[in-house]
Structures are given as C-alpha cells and as structure tokens.
Curated annotation (Swiss-Prot):
Pfam families xrefs: CASP_dom
CC annotations in GO: plasma membrane
Protein name per the record: CASP-like protein 5A1
Subunit and partners: Homodimer and heterodimers.
Cytoplasmic domain ranges by topology: 1-48, 98-121, 182-185
Membrane topology: Multi-pass membrane protein
Family: Belongs to the Casparian strip membrane proteins (CASP) family.
Transmembrane segments: 49-69, 77-97, 122-142, 161-181
Keywords: Cell membrane, Membrane, Transmembrane, Transmembrane helix
Length: 185
C-alpha cells in the first residue's frame, strides 16, 4: 500500500512499541531532546514564528526605507533592495509554515524539511549580510570620505542598513538553531 508521509509530525513523545517499556537510555535521550528544544525558537514553535516575524518586519522596513528614497543608482543599494525583498519572501513563507504547524499542533521535525530551512536561512543570511555591508561601505564613503550627505539622504540609508543588519542577525539565530536541530535529528 502506497501511503505518503506528512512533512509535519505530531508533537510529543511517541508511545512505546508493543506495550514494552522504554529502555533507560531511550528515556534519557527523549528527556534531553525535550529539555534542549523546549522554549527554543525552532521551526513550528511560537518562538520560531516570532523570530520569523521579526525577520520579516525588519527586512520590510529596510525595503520600505530604500523604496522611499527617490534616487539611488549605486549598485550596493540596488543589491540591498533585492536582498531585503528575498528576505521578506523567505521569512513570510516560513512564518506561514510555522502558523500552519502551530494550528494543527504538529512539529516540523522532518530532516528533509529542516535541511531546506537550513539552506534557505544560510543563503538569505549571507545575501542580506553582504548587501548590508556593501551599502554600509558606500554610506561611509559618501558621508565621511567625500562629505556628500547634504545632497544624499544618508540618514535614510543608515536606517535601512541598520534594519538589514537586524534582519541578518535574526536570520543568523534561526540558521544556527535550525542547523543544531538538524544535527540532532
């Protein structure tokens, strides 16, 4: 019989097979996993949802600030805009998955699904960090080296860059915790 397996699994400890007692080693492992993952912002948890919403909001603010600037022809700023759009889409998609997992009371413990989360978080974190660093370098050049902040909205650039770094920081936390979860599956 061909039956598909769900990507989300029930939350909780599975019962012992065949009415047999769970060996002490297994009980200790289950307790350790419960203690390690309880309250951590992992995929499918309320903390994970809050982390994803924080990533989304900070990337959205960075995007909104960059869009509100009339003229930005520097490549680093265009890259920041593209990276924040990608970050918004990725964080929003995973927030929707977290909401679904919370509504159906399921845990996202599938190794394939978690590995996709890890790779996606790693890629978006790298892109967001690179874009924020490149944009910060351009703002330092404009503001400090050639003193052109009077004709350029440096404060808006700085606000967008700060929000991009905040988004990167939250994605990095998510990446590390999800990678740790993948290593323990």
């Amino acid at each position: 019989m061909n039956v598909s397996h769900p990507a989300v699994h029930p939350v909780g400890v599975p019962p012992a097979l065949g009415g047999q007692a769970v060996p002490p080693r297994m009980r200790m492992r289950v307790r350790m996993e419960y203690l390690v993952f309880q309250g951590m912002p992992l995929p499918g948890s309320l903390g994970g949802l809050m982390l994803r919403l924080g990533q989304f909001c900070s990337a959205l603010i960075a995007f909104s600030v960059m869009v509100s600037i009339r003229d930005f022809s520097v490549t680093a700023f265009c890259y920041l805009l593209a990276a924040t759009v990608l970050q918004c889409l990725w964080s929003l998609a995973l927030a929707v998955i977290d909401v679904y997992a919370l509504l159906v009371k399921r845990s996202l413990r599938n190794p394939l699904l978690v590995s996709i989360f890890v790779v996606g978080d790693g890629v978006t974190a790298t892109l967001t960090f690179a874009a924020a660093c490149a944009s910060a370098g351009v703002v330092v050049l404009i503001g400090n080296d050639i003193s052109m902040c009077k004709s350029n909205p440096c404060a808006n650039y700085e606000a967008a860059i700060i929000m991009a770094f905040l988004s990167w920081f939250m994605v990095s936390i998510s990446f590390v915790l999800t990678f740790w979860m993948l290593a323990t599956l």
